[in-house]
Amino acid sequence: MLPAGPAALSRRARQDKVCRRPSTGCSASLDSLPSEVLLKILSYLDAAALLCAGCVNRRFYHLANDNFIWIRIYSTAFSPRRSHWRVDPAEKTDLSVNLLSAGDKEAGYWKKEYLTKQIASVKAALARVLKPLHPHTGLPVKTKEALRVSGLGWVIILRAADGREYTMEHADLSVNDSSVTVVWYGKDWPPLATLSTLDLCGATPVFMGQSRTPSRIRPRWHSLITKYQLSQLTESSAVGGDRLMRVFCLPPGLVVGLWKREEELAFVMANLHLHCLVERSMLGSPAVPYELPPHTPVSDDSPERGLHGYRLHVDMHSGGASCLCGSFHNLSASKGYLENEYMKLTVISFKNNTEHLPLIGKVGLSWKTNSFDGCIKSCSIMDLTLLEEYGKPFWCFSSPVCVRCCPGPSDGPSFLGEAYCVDYSDSEGRLHMELVWVEETEEYFIVSLALYLRLAKVNQWFGTQY
């Protein structure tokens, strides 16, 4: 072979340069490979990577649904485990039959079977973690462990009127005694005027043990918890503000902060009560929330069933600081307190000074964004858990509440200091709290607290006809 001269080297360099350009003649992409070759490559991927590969384009989606690939993944993940490597011959035969009949199933059959069983294993693991209950609240005591085991998180999906969607990952999360507080903030909010709804969804990884994998790229399924209408951000839903922020409440439990100057989104805070939170965050679909199974009344011949034996646990908190944490037992009502479709439970009475309680510290709703933070005075998050006589949660909520001026204690003696009240209501009941501001100690004292339960809920729960 003759040595290459300068002219030959120059021609070769030009050819290399041309071939490095993105042209149809020289480019070689995975999508140009035969399907048989692509299937061979996909067969080396694990389940998570295979699901991601199916999102590349329509061809990859169909190839990544191959039954022969998925039945091997299924068999490896859920093969029967026996000591000393012994496997039941019948189970081994079933596996062989499944491998032979994989081609007879519709495309994606074994992928669905694998994902169904994988999700069921996540739910089973969570059920074991969530089984121990707190004696006072009746709520799971290992919520933090359940979140760690499952990788459960929450996202909001903002929907524009033109059909566009914006999925936002949470920026902060804290677990309280009776609730979880999830916060979203950032600089990439779409213009509020273009948005119509906000979907709050639970987001659960299909595969456990992927906590180190960025949430955006790991396979997850969404469960719709609540759909909010952003058109309801009006003066009637405002709960307060400061020099930078106006804050609104959209029931149930959603706090929306708007920049005062721009009237654009600054943060969103979801307050989620722990009662059946995991079920609501995992068992729904992206479009339909999970519905709790209907309650079956306990057989009880007592003429006053449903009127006694209630237990209440109530918290008021914000930003990791609690100003109230109290439990109350043996709450009851008489038939004389059944009026206007409500049953009244007196928790704290004016007439018993020993029941009056202070709110510890400053009452305020803390907020933060990437650049600023602040506190909305006279607002707080209230978590309420009411258990009935059999220890089952009867009424639960986690929501912002406001301490507002009121005329004074409605049926009690005159107190020194200004009078305030806190009110909350939803479809199952309402709460009324009355407080007095003590100037000497600079703190609020709760001098009255009453719950009003809807008789329709009481009758449905206990099978009564009050």
Curated annotation (Swiss-Prot):
One of its GO terms (cellular component) is SCF ubiquitin ligase complex. InterPro entries: F-box-like_dom_sf, F-box_dom. It comes from the Eukaryota. Keywords: Ubl conjugation pathway. Residues 27-73 form the F-box domain. Directly interacts with SKP1 and CUL1. Substrate-recognition component of the SCF (SKP1-CUL1-F-box protein)-type E3 ubiquitin ligase complex. This is F-box only protein 15. It comes from Bos taurus (Bovine).
